[in-house]
């Protein structure tokens, strides 16, 4: 790391904070939507997919804005502030409208578009200096290792906040109870389940003793459960404040494309033609990469949707006799990346 340009660690730490906040949200988003609105995995998946589609589309918009303004650092700061506003909207427990939640997700997606790609562009420009050109690949591996450090701990933070709030309200966590509470309140629960499993679980999670009124219990547990989810989104705000402080304190270490462009000499006609041929070759290579990464991200982003639902519904949530939650499985992939990156480089 000591041989890398000075701005790399600063940029990596700023990205670590933002990714910590983002993956805190992604660890719980699907389960939050299902619990908050009483919807099934299919409906939650549509919102999840729409959100992720928006992230990738708005990343292009964020790049166009930064290119037009030639102010990458200002665009990055704006992205952090916009994302903070989106997470703040999700943090409010009184939000009951699905439209408001989707709107907040779109705000986060737009802020992400302003932030993520432009920060990575600045990291790439650190290696335009011939002194560091040979270290580019290693530098990006270090940069992405820092991203995964944030992603690795994020699910634990989300689960910790939710379960802490449940305890303050006199309840323990149970992955099945949210759906059962919705069934009881909606009148779709059979008498056998109401008098059997639902009553048994209610007694298990109630720290104050067996509930006298199951209707009151169902509403109280849902309120506490969903409020815990809302407060978990506040972790993202704290992480973004960290990112903002780190970025502002170190932004002079990062390149300024506007200054670099002003210092360039006017290229000759031959140089322009040569650059055009090189750009065309790079575009061909880029489209080849597109053909691969589309399927990679198609699979990867099942983490927050189908794999989370599979973990909750079809996995024994216990390790060495200790209970775990479905969200924790999302730490497995970044953990492997953090452990293996030093081996690779």
Please tell me what each predicted stretch does:
Residues 68-80, 134, 345:
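Cytoplasmic membrane-interface "Motif A"-like loop-to-helix N-cap segments
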Residues 2-52, 288-291, 297-313:
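Helix-loop boundary and gating motifs at the non-cytosolic
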Residues 46-68, 116, 152-154, 331-344:
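Central cavity-lining transmembrane alpha-helices of secondary-active solute carriers
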Residues 27, 60-61, 149-164:
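A gly/Pro-rich, aromatic-decorated transmembrane alpha-helix motif that marks the paired
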Residues 1-6, 129-133, 137, 159-322, ...:
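Intracellular loop-helix junctions on the cytosolic face of multi-pass helical membrane proteins
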